Amino acid sequence: MWRLKIAEGGNDPYLYSTNNYVGRQIWEFDPDAGTPEERAKAEEARQNFYKNRYQVKPSGDLLWRLQFLREKNFKQTIPQVRIEEGEEITREKATTALRRAVQFFSALQASDGHWPAENAGPLFFLPPLVMCMCITGHLDTVFPAEHRKEILRYIYYHQNEDGGWGLHIEGHSTMFCTALNYICMRILGEGPNGGQDDACTRARKWIHDHGSVTNIPSWGKTWLSILGVYDWSGCNPMPPEFWMLPSFLPMHPAKMWCYCRMVYMPMSYLYGKRFVGLITPLIQQLREELFTQPYDQINWKKNCHQCAPEDLYYPHPFIQDLIWDCLYISMEPLLTRWPLNMIIRKKALELTMKHIHYEDGSSRYITIGCVEKVLCMLACWVEDPNGDYFKKHLARIPDYIWVAEDGMKMQSFGSQQWDTGFAIQALLATNLTDEIGGVLRRGHDFIKKSQVQDNPSGDFKSMYRHISKGSWTFSDQDHGWQVSDCTAEGLKCCLLFSMMPPEIVGEHMEPERLYDSVNVLLSLQSKNGGLSAWEPAGAQDWLELLNPTEFFADIVIEHEYVERTSSAIHALVLFKKLYPGHRKKEIEDFIAKSVRFLESIQTSDGTWYGNWGVCFTYGTWFALGGLAAAGKTYNSCLAMRKAVDFLLRIQKDDGGWGESYLSCPEKKYVPLEANHSNLVHTAWAMMALVHAGQMDRDPTPLHRAAKLMINSQLEDGDFPQQEITGVFNRNCMLHYAAYRNIYPLWALAEYCRRVPLPS
C-alpha cells in the first residue's frame, strides 16, 4: 500500500537539507501496510476515478487523505446542513458549514505544519524522467514494479477517447504528449499492441493519422533525439555558446525568464554534445512504430520547423525561423569541426556545466522545476555517469513523485508553501482560533522554518541569480528559488500571527526577517509598478519573438503579473501598519505605483487576466483584493465598479461562477459548458465581491453563492473535486488539489465574517 511520508530524509549520503527536510513529502510503497478494508477503499477510489475519468479529469488526491484521516481517527462530528429552496441562510447554518469545513481540513495538516497536495496535470512531465532512467540504466531501481504499475495507470486513465494525450489532463490530444506517453508505455514493458483498453494501438493510430512524430514540437524533437528515436539534424540549433555571449547583448541569458534559461541550459549541453542514448532493440522498434516512412529515408532538415497543428499555440515568426536556419547552415558546421570544436565548443560546454552544477547545488539538487530537473540530471550523467552530481540528483527524484487514485505522476515541484500560506489565511478568517490553536501553531512553525535564510552562494549575480534572503519559495526552503507572491503571502501570514498571542500561535518572527522579506518584494517592482515573479523584469519585449517553444507563450523574459502585484500590496499595507518607521517612503511609493499598475491593465470588460489560475475570475479576485487593501472602494474606484458589474453579469442560475480553462489560451472569458458552476471559481468571485463591498449594496448575490457552497459540501466536510483551476504559460493547466478545500472554506469564512446574517 502507498504511504505518504513527511519531512524525512532517510540515510541517503547524497541527500542534504537546509532545515531538516521540513516540507518534504515523499511516497513509499509498503507491501505489508493497510488492512483489507483500507486497501479496498483505495481500490474503490481508483475504480471511481476510472469510471468518471472523462467527466472529472483531475484526481481527488484521495490516497494520502484516506491515510491521514485514518491515522488521526477523523470522524466528522458536526451534522451536515442544507439550505432549502426559498429558505434564508442563518448565521447558525453558515457557521455550521464553515466549522465542518475547518474540522475536515484541519485533519489533513501534516506533522510539520503544511498541507500536502498534488500539484501536477501536464502530461509531458513524467515521460522524460522515465526516458532518462532508461538511458542511464536506473529504470529498475528508481521505478520498481509497483511504481511502474502506477505510472501506467496514470497514462491509461488520462488517455483521451481519440487515443491521444493532451498537453495537460483536460486538453485535446497533442503530438508531443501522445508520442511521449506512447514511448513511456513501451519503455515500461508494454508491447506495440499492449496496454489497457488497447492504449498502444490507439495511440500509434493517432500519431500516424496526424503525420507521425516528424510533426512533434521542438521539445519533443529534443527528447526523441536524446533517446535515439529522432535525429539531432532535425532539430533547431541550441548552441551552448549562447552562455558565452557578452552581457551587453539584449538576448543575454541573464535577461531571460529563469525557467526558460534553466530549460535551455542543459538542453544546449546535450545538443552541443549531440548526445544519444544506447540504440537498443526497443529503440529500433520505436523507429519503425512512430514514423509513416522508413527511418533511414527521412529528410531530417526538412522537419526542423514542422509542428502538428494540434500542438501549435505560438507560431514562430519568420525572423525566428530565419535565425535558426542561419545557425543551422553557417554556425553549427563550424563549431562542430576542428579546430573550433576544441577551442570554442569545448569551452562552451564546460561553462554550461558550470552553470548547471551551480543551479543544482543552490537547490539541493531539486532544481527549479521538473522539466529542468530531468535535463540537468541527464547532463550530469553524460558528463560523468559515476559522479556524485548524478547521484545527488537521483536522491531527489522522490521529491517530485506523487501518487493518487489516478496513478503515479510527476509534480511541478510541490506547492507546500503556496498552499499553506492561503490555508492559514483562510483559517484565520474563520475567527475559530479557540478550536484550531494547535493547527495554527503548526502552520506558523512551518512558515517560519520555510523562509529562505540566505542568498544564493558565492558571486550569485555572475550566475544570473537574484537575491533570495528573506523570501519564500513555492514549495520548501531547500528549493531555494524566491517567488514574489509566495514571499508576500508568507510575510502576510507572519504579520497576522504577530498580532496574536504567542502562547496560542507560537513565537513571533523576528523583525529583521520580516525586513528581509520586504527587501525582496521592493526589489522586484518594475518601472510600470507591476511585480515580477522570480527576478526583476526589464528585458525588451521584442525578445518574445524568439520564443522557441510552440505550445507556450510569454516565456522568454520575466513579466509583471496582477496576482504578484496584489499579493505584495496586501502584505506591504499590513507591514506599514505594524512597522510604520521601516522604509516608509519606499513602501508608500511601491503601493501607489502598484495600484496604478492594476488599474492600467484592467481589460475593457472590467476583468483582469489571471496568469496562474483560471482565469479572469482568478485575476479579478486578486486585483480587487489589492485595490481594497490599498484603500480603494466601490464608490471611489471606477475599476472596482467595472469589475463588480462583470462578476454580477456572469453569475450563474445556481448562484455560482464557472469559467472554462479555455479562457487562458484564448485570452477571453469562456464560461463552463451547460451553465455549470465550479466551487473554487465561486469562492474567488465571492471574495472579490466582498472586497468590493457588495454586502453593503445588495448581499443577494453573496447569499445565492453561499447557498450553493453550503449545499455542495460533502458529508465529511470536504468539497467535491471539479475542473482544473491552475495554469502557467497561458496554455498549460496545473491541478492544485488543495484548492477545493482552501477557497470554499475561505469564502464561507469571509461570508460569515462580513455579510450580515439573521441569527
Curated annotation (Swiss-Prot):
Catalytic EC class? isomerase
Q: Name one GO cellular component term.
A: lipid droplet
- Which reaction(s) does the protein catalyse, per the Swiss-Prot or TrEMBL entry? (S)-2,3-epoxysqualene = germanicol; (S)-2,3-epoxysqualene = beta-amyrin; (S)-2,3-epoxysqualene = lupeol
Task: Note the InterPro entries from the entry.
Answer: SQ_cyclase_C, SQ_cyclase_N, Squalene_cyclase, Terpenoid_cyclase/PrenylTrfase
Pathway linked to the protein: Terpene metabolism
Keywords from the UniProt entry: Isomerase, Repeat
Question: What is an annotated GO biological process for this record, any one?
Answer: triterpenoid biosynthetic process
What's the domain of life for this entry?
Eukaryota
Any one GO molecular function term = beta-amyrin synthase activity
User: Which EC number applies?
Assistant: 5.4.99.34
Protein family per UniProt: Belongs to the terpene cyclase/mutase family.
* PANTHER family linked: BETA-AMYRIN SYNTHASE-RELATED (PTHR11764:SF58), TERPENE CYCLASE/MUTASE FAMILY MEMBER (PTHR11764)
This chain's function reads:
Multifunctional triterpene synthase producing germanicol, beta-amyrin and lupeol in the ratio 63:33:4.
Write down what this protein is called.
Germanicol synthase
